[in-house]
Amino acid sequence: MVFRKSLLKLAVFALGACVAFSNANAAEGKLESIKSKGQLIVGVKNDVPHYALLDQATGEIKGFEVDVAKLLAKSILGDDKKIKLVAVNAKTRGPLLDNGSVDAVIATFTITPERKRIYNFSEPYYQDAIGLLVLKEKKYKSLADMKGANIGVAQAATTKKAIGEAAKKIGIDVKFSEFPDYPSIKAALDAKRVDAFSVDKSILLGYVDDKSEILPDSFEPQSYGIVTKKDDPAFAKYVDDFVKEHKNEIDALAKKWGL
């Protein structure tokens, strides 16, 4: 009986050691696999002016976050051309990271306590606040004027919750319509199917035209982080250190793109 117990303890210890070894390998594996394949795969938006926008003439995605992704590729692989960009939106960026289609996501991904339980976030590389884009003819001056308004937001974004809470705080009710991407929201605004387009202000800047304006209101500061899988602590640390060490370069890139 004593012998059996000893064997059981030994088996449990061995299993624990294997799990720990496996976890350690998984943690270190992402960075090594990127170096091994010689390419960093990053999920970026393709519909956000200044951040990451598809150039219809060349087929390339260009913008601030694309340049940050290239800077990360250069840091890891020594060459900013050793990168593959995968277009994502607010609804697909998490699943594509989960299933391994991308190594990291740099796509206006707001850091929240809920999301930090699911993913690893670097420290913020950019900070913004949520705003409202409206048609000038509506004569809105602030959210307080928008009782009963229908506000267009992106699917799976933090915007709906932030604006909903702000509206409740000032005692008005608003409705929401969710869309798969930002151009769809702008089209709905232009067609007067929604009364406002709400997302982070620097994103809205890319959609302002002579018929629309961004209201002065700002809601819930948004901090963007580079996102990696939760089971990659070594890679997450590398990415976090990268953001800290390249802060000045990243800030310069933001200015380059008018942010």
Swiss-Prot record:
GO terms for cellular component: cell surface; extracellular region; outer membrane-bounded periplasmic space. SUPFAM superfamilies: Periplasmic binding protein-like II. Keywords: Signal, Transport. Its main location: other. InterPro entries: Bact_solute-bind_prot3, SBP_3_CS, Solute-binding_3/MltF_N. CDD domains: PBP2_Peb1a_like (cd13691). PROSITE patterns: SBP_BACTERIAL_3. It holds the Pfam family SBP_bac_3. PANTHER family: ABC TRANSPORTER GLUTAMINE-BINDING PROTEIN GLNH (PTHR30085:SF6), AMINO ACID ABC TRANSPORTER PERMEASE (PTHR30085). This is Major cell-binding factor. The gene is peb1A.
